[in-house]
């Protein structure tokens, strides 16, 4: 009698352009190798034929999806009642700059009083990540300058809608609006922001990534949660543990291969070079990819949730601790014994590293 056959378990993975442990594991082929035994059908979400499945990177409604990406969509989805839980968090600091025209007369955050602050706007987005990210950056800068963000003058910068994945380099519509004089200041982060600030016609009012307080550095990409839907985790905990083990392996490899990591990350950042990735994240990038659930990372998610509630990007509050399931990662870390140095780079170390990069 022929034994019954079982269909492979469908496992989707997703990571948005940026420095992620998942992206590194995919670039090196480790994730594919870990699930090549035939029992699991590993698929990239961006390759799905269904638009709704692709958009699960934002709405988190696809079963069998392990997602590593920006925190705004993850928090929004949880607020909307999705069952995805956080099984790990990475903290990769990145450039976060308020930029103005050099001839604007704006030199410090306090000088932003009464100025036109540009916020991108995507009218059809499930959750407008870019707008929330920019407003978060401005609010932090205004508060550091002793100003009331509620009194700020916000100006819409219309952005075209797009579907995940965004394969082409996006137009720099915020930069266009700034240079054309439609707004007085914009917020840019990551490699895009780092590349833009090299323009001698622009002035950097503040780089929030230089703040000592990590909660002042919280934005869409910092911290990044790793999520999976609760039903899939309950049915297939061994698959989730295997996935996390690959990310831990990749993070440990990255910690000793700093020269290679920026090039690998740049492959997931369309239109930007390894040098720009290194400039945006600093030379400690390779030591920042280890998934963790340390209290400071969780506090970063809680701070972002507070902001999104206060500024009405989400409608419903929820308990951060109930959103997190620490068991899978705890099981993996007991086996892999990660290096103790992996964690959030201190801003003072970032400032030194940034000076070293600019001196090259």
Give the residues covered by each predicted segment.
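Short, solvent-exposed loop/beta-turn-alpha elements that line the ligand-binding surface or hinge
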Residues: 32-37, 210-216, 287-296
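Pocket-lining segment of extracytoplasmic ligand-binding domains
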Residues: 72, 163-267
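Conserved C-terminal helix/tail region of periplasmic/extracytoplasmic solute-binding proteins
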Residues: 308-360
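Secondary-structure end/capping motifs
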Residues: 236-315
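Short, surface-exposed acidic
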Residues: 37-45, 147-154, 269-286, 315-322
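Short glycine-centered helix-capping/turn motifs at secondary-structure transition points
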Residues: 24, 28-29, 181, 200, ...
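Short, glycine-/small- and polar/acidic-enriched structural segments
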Residues: 4-150, 154-157, 348-360
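Short, flexible helix-coil linker/hinge segments at the edges of structured domains or between repeats
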Residues: 148-172
């Amino acid at each position: 009698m022929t034994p019954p056959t079982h269909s492979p378990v469908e496992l989707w993975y997703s990571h948005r352009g940026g420095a992620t442990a998942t992206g590194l594991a995919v670039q090196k082929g480790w994730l594919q190798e870990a699930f090549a035994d035939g029992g699991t059908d590993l698929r990239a979400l961006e390759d799905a034929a269904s638009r709704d499945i692709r958009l699960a990177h934002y709405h988190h409604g696809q079963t069998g999806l392990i997602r590593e990406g920006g925190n705004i969509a993850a928090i929004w989805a949880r607020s909307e009642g999705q069952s995805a839980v956080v099984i790990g968090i990475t903290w990769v600091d990145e450039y976060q700059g308020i930029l103005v025209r050099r001839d604007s007369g704006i030199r410090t955050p306090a000088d932003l009083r009464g100025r036109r602050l540009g916020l991108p706007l995507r009218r059809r987005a499930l959750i407008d990540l870019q707008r929330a990210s920019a407003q978060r950056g401005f609010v932090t800068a205004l508060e550091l300058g002793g100003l009331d963000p509620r009194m700020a003058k916000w100006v819409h910068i219309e952005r075209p809608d797009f579907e995940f994945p965004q394969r082409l380099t996006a137009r720099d519509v915020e930069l266009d609006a700034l240079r054309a004089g439609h707004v007085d200041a914009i917020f840019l982060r990551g490699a895009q922001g780092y590349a833009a600030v090299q323009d001698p016609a622009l002035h950097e009012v503040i780089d929030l990534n230089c703040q000592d307080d990590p909660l002042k550095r919280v934005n869409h990409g910092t911290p990044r949660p790793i999520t999976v839907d609760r039903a899939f985790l309950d049915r297939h905990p061994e698959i989730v543990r295997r996935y996390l083990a690959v990310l831990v392996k990749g993070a440990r490899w990255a910690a000793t291969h700093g020269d290679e990591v920026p090039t690998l990350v740049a492959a997931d950042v369309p239109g930007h070079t390894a040098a720009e990735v290194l400039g945006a994240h600093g030379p400690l990038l390779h030591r920042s990819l280890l998934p963790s659930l340390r209290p400071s990372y969780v506090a970063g998610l809680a701070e972002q949730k507070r902001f999104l509630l206060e500024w009405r990007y989400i409608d419903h509050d929820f308990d951060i601790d109930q959103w997190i399931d620490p068991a899978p990662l705890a099981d993996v870390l007991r086996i892999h014994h990660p290096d103790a140095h992996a964690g959030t780079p201190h801003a003072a170390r970032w400032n030194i590293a940034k000076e070293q990069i600019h001196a090259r």
